């Protein structure tokens, strides 16, 4: 059964932030999901503007 835990990546190693019930040497699959904070742009941004930024065409206007 999948279990979600938080971990920190330091010196090339994922370090769990809580106790993990695993045997030494046991293999697991890790799905990475970066924790990000929202950016306050100070004003509303349209979907079209977001698409331009995503597509890299925002500098051409």
UniProtKB/Swiss-Prot annotation:
It holds the Pfam family AF2212-like. Possibly the antitoxin component of a type II toxin-antitoxin (TA) system. Its cognate toxin is VapC21 (Potential). The gene is vapB21. This is Putative antitoxin VapB21. SUPFAM superfamilies: AF2212/PG0164-like. It comes from Archaeoglobus fulgidus (strain ATCC 49558 / DSM 4304 / JCM 9628 / NBRC 100126 / VC-16). Keywords: Toxin-antitoxin system. Belongs to the UPF0165 family. It comes from the Archaea. InterPro entries: AF2212-like (IPR008203), AF2212-like_dom_sf (IPR024069).
């Amino acid at each position: 059964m999948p279990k979600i835990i938080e971990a920190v990546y330091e010196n090339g190693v994922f370090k769990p932030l809580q106790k993990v019930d695993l045997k030494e040497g046991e293999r697991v699959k890790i799905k990475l999901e970066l924790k990000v904070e929202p950016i306050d742009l100070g004003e509303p941004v349209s979907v079209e503007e977001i698409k331009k930024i995503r597509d890299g065409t925002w500098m051409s206007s």
